Design a protein with these regions (language model features):
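N-terminal export/targeting leaders of redox proteins
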Residues: 1-37, 116-117
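Processing junctions and N-termini across compartments
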Residues: 16, 22, 41-44, 85, ...
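Local sequence-structure signature of Cys/Sec-based thiol-disulfide redox active-site neighborhoods
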Residues: 37-49
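The canonical Cys-X-X-Cys-His
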Residues: 47-53, 108
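Gly/Gly-Pro-rich "capping" loops immediately C-terminal to redox-active cysteine motifs
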Residues: 51-80
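Axial heme c-ligation environment in periplasmic c-type cytochrome domains
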Residues: 58, 83-106, 112-115
């Protein structure tokens, strides 16, 4: 990406970050654009295999599946993210997202939660 586009993207991102958004999903989408991380694409590549089917006890993702997540969320979002980062039960550390950092994992968890409303 050339410097002009980078500068423009950074300026738009800075302005948009101070604007009022209709919901948190828009903020998440902006963050994905600004750092090149796309939670939906990464979910499909790294999380879908287990979380779409509930394999090995993974909480399912999809409309109306929040009840699968609620027992895990009783400990708080940070605990859910920590479990995803460190691994829990049959899930290995970072699931199958070996190139994800902790912020990426948090974005993936938030994406799965939003998708499960």
């Amino acid at each position: 990406m050339n410097n002009f586009l980078k500068s423009s993207l950074m300026a738009v991102t800075a302005f948009a970050a101070t604007a009022s958004f209709a919901n948190d999903r828009e903020v998440l989408q902006l963050a994905q654009v600004s750092d090149g991380f796309n939670a939906e694409q990464k979910y499909m590549a790294s999380c879908f295999a287990c979380h779409s089917t509930g394999a090995a006890g993974a909480p399912k993702v999809g409309a109306g599946m929040m009840s699968e997540w609620e027992p895990r969320l009783e400990k708080g979002l940070d605990a859910v993210v920590a479990n995803a980062v460190n691994g829990v039960n049959a899930m290995p550390a970072k699931g199958l997202c070996f190139d994800c950092n902790e912020d990426d994992i948090r974005a993936l968890v938030e994406y799965m939660l939003e998708t499960s409303q």
